[in-house]
Amino acid sequence: MNFDRMRALLLEQAVQGKLVPQLEDEPAVEQIGEAPNVVPLLIPKTWKWVRLNNLTTIVRGGSPRPIQAFLTDREDGLNWVKIGDAERGSMHISQCAEKIIPAGLKKTRFIRKGSLLLTNSMSFGYPYILDVDGCIHDGWLAFSDFEEFSTKEYLYYVLLSPYCRGAFVEKAAGAVVKNLNIDKVKQVYVPIPPLAEQHQIVGKLEEYFAEIDRAEKAFRELQTLAGVLKKKILQEAVMGKLVPQLDGEPAVEQLGETPEIIPFEIPQKWKWLTFNEVLSFENGDRGTNYPAKSTLTKDSSSGQPFISAVNLQNLHISNDNLLYLSKEQQRKLRSGHVKAGDCLFCIRGSLGKFAFADKDGGAIASSLVILRPKPCNCIMQKYLSYVLLSPYFTAYMNDRRNGTAQPN
């Protein structure tokens, strides 16, 4: 469920005058400065398109350098407002991680609590309201002197809207490092309704956003609960507690030695077997015949799939980013040829990811190993997948990671 998209749709409606009814007795907004030659969006008759430079005073922050020489933890230090202090999706910046000494004030810009800010570098084009006094660096723009024509909250939501986001992205286009030049921001037009209508729009947005926030929280909690239940069900399944045992079913034959210490109790007819007793393991050919990536192609008509960890998605082999090797390249490979029903298991990087091949053809990259059921037919494919997904096996794998940057 895309909650961010819901918020964006509401903002789209808001800046086009479609979120709340227009007030019939409200006079039209006075045209401030020149109207745009081409209007970006259709808006109600009582609204006006106003260039930000005519609506508000915009200033850029400043940075004392080197900043390390100005940082302090003294009580008389001034809050140093960084983009990292802003939480994406939050309207407010309520605290700052660092402070600077008062001497740095000459080389920065001091902003009062309640100021409206906009990021103009790094993650540019995101507005925030500052809840503390502080100094802003040159990655921030500050807005002021707009109260005669716009409420702070309405202007915040306009700057947050998909319309303004698109305008900012367009203004930043072409640069190697995507930054918002202050002069370009000043040229952006924004839709301004009558003040009374602005209050209504803000109130309705806050009402809807609060409902979305509650729904999103409930959805996340439900996802967490579903994950917990899934793990519990899988664990009960591999312990023989999920379904009743069949009285007429013979016991599983013990293949190999019984473990000295069993991980947990299982039904009497079950047996503890190693994977090696029920599965064959086959690595890919990692010798001189291993194909270089530069020799592979994205053209599916040229040969056979060369399957790597990135192609294992949701227990299936995804065609996204799938590369192909020629039939001659596959013919030279001494091992790692995929057959229908094979379990392709990741042993490097994304350790423990797996998927099942639904047809013959292709070969595996060095990050994978093939798990292939032995002729004893002791384990079903679906049951194997549940074992591999179970908390027991996940813990087993985690205990045996080698601790390197790339687990294997």
Protein language model regions, located:
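Short amphipathic coiled-coil heptad-repeat segments
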Residues: 1-25, 29-32, 209-255
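Non-catalytic DNA-recognition/assembly elements of restriction-modification systems
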Residues: 9, 37-63, 187, 191, ...
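Short coil/turn segments at secondary-structure boundaries
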Residues: 22-27, 65-72, 170-172, 244-250, ...
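Short, solvent-exposed beta-strand edge segments and adjacent coil->beta transition regions
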Residues: 38, 138-140, 185-187, 261, ...
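Amphipathic alpha-helical segments
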Residues: 47, 155, 184-220, 270, ...
